[in-house]
Structure formats: structure tokens, C-alpha cells
From Swiss-Prot:
Subcellular location as annotated: Cytoplasm
Binding-site positions, ATP: 50-57
Protein name: ATP-dependent RNA helicase DeaD
CDD domains associated with the record: DEADc, RRM_EcCsdA_like, SF2_C_DEAD
């Protein structure tokens, strides 16, 4: 039996798991699933190289579920994921696959959740724990996560954990679990650090490498926009300037289909939602309106859009980025049908850059970034549409009746025809002004814009974070966090927490100066308020960091050095006083680079 001929029922999985797969529409395993499931069922260690979207979550979760002891209420499977989004996604997959197996409890653990909530869940004895390295390490240090019954460990997207600076935490966790256990490591690439982990912690792993064969059609023009501000406002801007016959907008949830549809309706767009709550009759009626041209905009979830085939769709908008690359390919494949050219736009939030890179790797193509259309373009498009409507009215046959009505309203002596036409033009523009004086949607000049970062793993920064190059002073802000050496905090903890909880690329984190009770961190200018609110609540080793912006970098630098000198010499105040002027002078002459050198003092 070859992999391509096999079905899940022939792999020897639990019948209840097969039932879940059948209900979810899974019939034939993907190449990574067909290769990994038999090995993991046998208890072998597996080293898998596969892209996101290849089905690797099912490749490890299905066999591990099969071998689980449902009568033992203790963590038996531990999955490490680089981000909270992936941790939640993997946890949901475990829950979906075990839907018909009674007594299985899955728990995601990640930063941002209250410890009290997680502690209550841990006391219930989950058999499967999925979490981010930082939060898992916190629980291990607190003694609230007992891994003595663990039989399987999974590292999902190991290269991403390396890139985000979590690899030391990963190694610490792996060194604290029982020696007798099964390990599965999945990575899109295999840098030397990941290879080293596999040699150190895995037992004769079977290496599986799956080449992606997912492609997109060349007649579909793809681009992405880095989200800032309100997504609905930006969506309307793109719709206004784009020429399209019909468009489908993909969102993650059923509620989002309704929310986006209502926002578009308020702005004068004829749109409809398509989700799983619709009965078949209403679904068919909506699709018929789309096909006939009575409806131009459809907002749908991936599940609801299955089987949708409408030739007149020329524009696909990924309002919410899909979690896997294959879904992206299926989405944009809805456009460019019947020999027509298609257009696909992807909205990407800062915390979703990882998903964008996964999509690009999968389709073996770089997706170009586009900017939000400027008001000059918007005004031009509005004026063109307005002029077209006016021309249509000029060609109508009943204008004489309205000319007579105009004579009753105003006499030629009252005002000239141009002034009257201008007043009517202003009235007719409605809620979409033809003259826009200020663009409220453009990115503020201070706001930090993450650049295209498509360098592969061989170009990653040196793992010795003390040697990180310093960014120009004008491009960064200084922040103080209330956690330091006395709290057991190290530089790597700070990098990992900010990268994960703030979804900031670790390359964009500047130098860090660690003190006894606090630390000073360089971060890019213009961080959003929402991002800072998330960071304020972030904890490092169970201590809230309460991050604060330091406004005056230069003055703070001098104050910090003076304080440091004073602390070192506090037992000899007189000598400090005698030499104070000399030392202050030397401090002022000291270069900024020495202050920002990343090391403990």
C-alpha cells in the first residue's frame, strides 16, 4: 500500500478518531501524515521538515492521541509552539480530533492569561498541554506543571522558536522531562541549532522531508498590506479604488462575516454574509444573487465558501489571514476564473508576519507589499464615478421636466448657473465627499513599520545577544521594565517575552541593559497603544514588567551612570563628593554606544 493509496482507516487509528476525521471531511492523509503517523504510532522519534499548511498538526496529534491513556489524569503529551495563536490552534486541533473520545482534556498555556485561570485548569489534570516556551518554563519553575507522566514531546515550528529567541528556554524544558519519552520535532528549515537539539535530545530520529507542491496560478496578482488603524476603514478604502466585478472577503469567524457585512452596508455597499449558520435555501439564494450580478460583495468563512465557484469574482480579500498556507491558496483560487485575470489582497497584522513568511515559503513566491491608497487616488476615483453618473443623467430623456422645476426654485437673476451647480454637487456627494482635506487613515510618521523580513535562517542574527548591533538612536525609544537580576531575569527572558507577547520580531529589539531591579530596553519608535497595553500586562518569571517609555534618552543616560557610580561607592560618600565633578565629566564624554552595550552591570 503506497502513501497515495492509503486512507486514515488503514493507518490503524482509534475508530473514534476516524469518526472525528470523517465528520471533519478528512479522507486521505497528506504526504507528511502518511509518513509520520505509522512511525509515531510505533513510538519512534520523528524529525519532520514540512511547511505550515502541509497537515503536520494532524501528523503528530492523531498518533499521539491514539496512544494516550485516558484514565490517567495528568499531562502525557506536551507541545511547544512559538506563539499563542499557534498554541491555541494546535489545542483546538487536539480537541476536534478527540471529539468522540470521552475524558480527554486539552489545555493551552500562554502568556497574557491570568495564572489563576491556568492553575485551576492544571488542577483538573489535562492529558495534553500545548504552550509557549516562556509560560511553560514559568509553570515548571513554580512547580505547577508536573511532567513526570509525560510520554510524548512535540516541538512545532522549531525554527520559528529559534528565530524568536526561545531556543534556550526550549532546551531547559527538554532537560527537565523524563528521559523515557517520545519526541517529534517539526521545522520548515533545519538550521544548525535545531540540528544540534535533535542530536542531543532525540533517539535515532526518523527524518521525514516533504517538499511543498502547492502553487498559485500566475494570472492572480497577489499583494499584502501591513495593518494599522481600523481594518474596516482600510477595507472600504481598498474597495473604493479597486476595479472589480465581484469580490469575496474571507474572515475567520461567523460573527466576523456579520460585522464586516454590516460595516459595508453602512457605507453604501451591497454585501452579504455567508457562514455556517445559514440554511441551504438562503445560501443558494445568496450565491445566485452573486452569480447574476445583483450582489457584488460576499463575506465568508473558509468552511462556508467550500465548493463556491463564481466566474465573475475578480478580487479576493483575505481580511483575516489564514492559519495555514493551503487555505490561502484555496481562497485566492476563487478569482481569475474562466480566463480572467484575478487580484488577491492579504491583510497582515504585525503579529502575523510569521504566517506571511510561511505562505511565501509554501508557494515559493514573494508577495509584494502595497500601501494604503492615498487620498489623491481616492478623490480621483470618486470624481470619476460621480462624473459617470452625471453623464448618464445628461443622456436621460426627462431633463426638461427638471429644468422647469429649477425655474420655479430660482430665477436666473438670483444666482448664476455655476454657483447653483456647485451647491447641487456638494449636496449630491452624500457620505463620500469628493474633496478630502485630511487623510485620517494614513500611517502616522512616528509609527513603526515592520520592514519586509524574508532572510532565511542562515542569515539569522548571532545567538550571542550581547553582540547585537546597535540601531541608530533616532529609530528607537527607551523603555523601562520592572524586572531585573534580583528577580532571576536574564536578557534572553526579556527578548523572548517581548518577541512573543508583543509579537515583535526579535531582530527589532535593540540593546538591553540589565540592573538589579529593572532593565532598560531599546524598542522601535511608534509602538501602538494596543501593543504597549499587551506588554504592560506581560510577566517575566511571574513578575509583571509594567513597561514604561522613557522620554528623555540623553538625560536618562547621564542619570543612570551617576546612580550606578553612587551605588558602587555608597560607603564612601566623601570620596564620591570629591571626585563627583571629574566622574560626571567623564560620563558626559562617554559615547552612547558604551551605555547601550547589552550586558549586565
Amino acid at each position: 500500500m503506497t502513501h497515495t493509496e492509503s486512507t486514515f482507516s488503514f493507518l490503524g487509528l482509534n475508530p473514534f478518531i476516524i469518526k472525528s476525521l470523517s465528520k471533519m471531511g478528512y479522507v486521505k492523509p497528506s504526504p507528511i501524515q502518511a509518513a509520520c503517523i505509522p512511525l509515531l504510532l510505533e513510538g519512534r522519534d520523528v524529525l519532520g521538515m514540512a511547511q505550515t499548511g502541509s497537515g503536520k498538526t494532524a501528523a503528530f496529534s492523531l498518533p499521539l492521541l491514539h496512544n494516550l491513556n485516558i484514565n490517567l489524569k495528568a499531562p502525557q503529551i506536551l507541545v511547544l509552539a512559538p506563539t499563542r495563536e499557534l498554541a491555541v490552534q494546535v489545542a483546538e486541533a487536539f480537541s476536534d480530533f478527540s471529539k468522540y473520545i470521552m475524558g480527554i482534556h486539552v489545555l493551552p498555556l500562554y502568556g497574557g492569561q491570568r495564572y489563576e485561570v491556568q492553575l485551576r485548569a492544571l488542577r483538573q489534570g489535562p492529558q495534553i498541554v500545548v504552550g509557549t516556551p516562556g509560560r511553560l518554563l514559568d509553570h515548571l519553575k513554580r512547580g505547577t506543571l508536573n511532567l513526570s507522566n509525560l510520554y510524548a514531546l512535540v516541538l512545532d515550528e522549531a525554527d520559528e522558536m529559534l528565530r524568536m529567541g526561545f531556543i534556550e528556554d526550549v532546551e531547559t524544558i527538554m532537560s527537565q522531562i523524563p528521559k523515557e519519552h517520545q519526541t517529534a520535532l517539526f521545522s520548515a528549515t533545519m538550521p544548525e541549532a535545531i540540528r544540534r537539539i535533535s542530536k542531543r535530545f532525540m533517539k535515532n530520529p526518523q527524518e521525514i522531508k516533504i517538499q511543498s507542491n502547492i502553487t498559485t496560478r500566475p494570472d492572480i496578482k497577489q499583494s499584502y498590506w501591513m495593518v494599522y488603524g481600523r481594518k474596516t476603514d482600510a477595507l472600504i478604502r481598498f474597495l473604493e479604488v479597486e476595479d472589480f466585478s465581484a469580490t469575496i472577503i474571507f474572515v475567520k469567524t461567523k460573527n466576523a462575516t456579520l460585522e464586516v457585512s454590516e460595516a459595508l452596508e453602512r457605507n453604501g455597499y451591497n454585501s452579504a454574509a455567508l457562514n455556517g449558520d445559514m440554511n441551504q435555501a438562503l445560501r443558494e439564494q445568496t450565491l445566485e444573487r452573486l452569480k447574476s450580478g445583483r450582489l457584488d460583495i460576499l463575506i465568508a468563512t473558509d468552511v462556508a465558501a467550500r465548493g463556491l465557484d463564481v466566474d465573475r469574482i475578480s478580487f479576493v480579500i483575505n481580511y483575516d489571514i489564514p492559519m495555514d498556507s493551503e487555505s490561502y491558496v484555496h481562497r485566492i483560487g476563487r478569482t481569475g476564473r474562466a480566463g480572467r485575470a484575478g487580484r488577491a489582497l492579504l491583510f497582515v497584522e504585525n503579529r502575523e508576519r510569521r504566517l506571511l513568511r510561511n505562505i511565501e515559503r509554501t508557494i515559493n513566491q514573494t508577495i509584494p507589499e502595497v500601501q494604503l491608497p492615498k487620498i489623491e487616488v481616492l478623490c480621483k476615483r470618486r470624481l470619476e464615478r460621480f462624473a459617470k453618473k452625471v453623464q448618464e443623467q445628461l443622456e436621460s430623456r426627462d431633463l426638461d421636466e427638471y429644468s422647469a422645476l429649477l425655474d420655479k426654485l430660482y430665477s436666473p437673476d438670483d444666482l448664476d448657473i455655476k454657483t447653483l451647480a456647485s451647491a447641487l454637487l456638494k449636496m449630491a456627494q452624500g457620505g463620500r465627499p469628493l474633496i478630502i482635506k485630511k487623510d485620517l487613515l494614513q500611517r502616522p510618521s512616528r509609527e513603526f513599520s515592520f520592514k519586509d523580513d524574508r532572510r532565511r535562517e542562515d542569515n539569522h542574527r548571532n545567538n550571542n545577544r550581547n553582540r547585537r548591533e546597535r540601531r541608530e538612536l533616532k529609530d528607537i525609544d527607551l523603555y523601562r521594565i520592572e524586572a531585573g537580576r534580583n528577580d532571576g531575569v536574564e536578557v534572553r527572558h526579556i527578548v523572548g517575552a517581548i518577541a512573543n507577547e508583543g509579537n515583535i520580531n526579535s531582530r527589532n529589539i535593540g540593546n538591553i541593559k540589565l540592573f538589579s531591579s529593572y532593565a532598560i530596553v531599546e524598542l522601535p519608535k511608534g509602538l501602538s497603544k494596543d501593543l504597549l497595553q499587551r506588554l504592560i500586562k506581560t510577566k517575566i518569571l511571574n513578575k509583571k514588567i509594567n513597561i514604561k517609555l522613557l522620554r528623555d534618552i540623553k538625560n536618562y543616560e547621564t542619570r543612570t551612570h551617576n546612580r550606578s557610580i553612587f551605588n558602587k561607592d555608597k560607603n564612601n560618600k566623601r570620596r564620591f563628593s570629591d571626585n563627583r565633578l571629574n566622574k560626571s565629566s567623564s560620563i558626559k564624554n562617554e559615547t552612547k554606544s558604551s551605555f547601550f552595550r547589552r550586558k549586565s552591570v
